[in-house]
Design a protein with these regions (language model features):
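Secreted/periplasmic proteins
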Residues: 2-129
Length: 129
């Protein structure tokens, strides 16, 4: 029982999002968690930035990074990566381990379209202007 609790505790640590404040406002070391994606049902809807969502653009939703920030998202299983602009807020569903929602185009680039979710690392590459 102790061993099981220890394993669950370690698993929880790896799924806990790292606040950007821990990196002086910039997630240089990265944030690890799960990415999901959103597409056609949201096409044309306004995002938190005021832009219209386009599933063909390389954009993403994040709960706390400033809108306009560019991040590199790396699929930890396949090592595929993409740079996206944060233009929306989320993810709001799917469980506590989710840290970013990718547009359909971005999800395709990192190879998570078919699986729906994947463990990723998110690293800020350019702060919002």
């Amino acid at each position: 029982m102790r061993r099981l609790l220890a394993i669950l505790g370690l698993f929880g640590i790896f799924l806990t999002p790292i606040p950007e404040a821990a990196f002086g406002g910039r997630a240089q070391a990265g944030q690890v968690g799960f990415a999901s994606w959103y597409g056609k049902p949201h096409q044309g809807q306004k995002t938190a930035s005021g832009e219209r969502f386009s599933r063909g653009q390389l954009t993403a939703a994040h709960r706390s990074l400033p809108l306009g920030t560019k991040v590199k998202v790396t699929n930890l299983r396949t090592k595929q990566h993409v740079v996206v602009k944060i233009n929306d807020r989320g993810p709001y569903g799917g469980g506590k381990g989710r840290i970013i929602d990718l547009s359909e185009a971005a999800a395709k680039r990192v190879g998570i379209l078919a699986r729906g979710t994947e463990r990723v690392q998110v690293v800020v590459v350019e702060n919002a202007s």
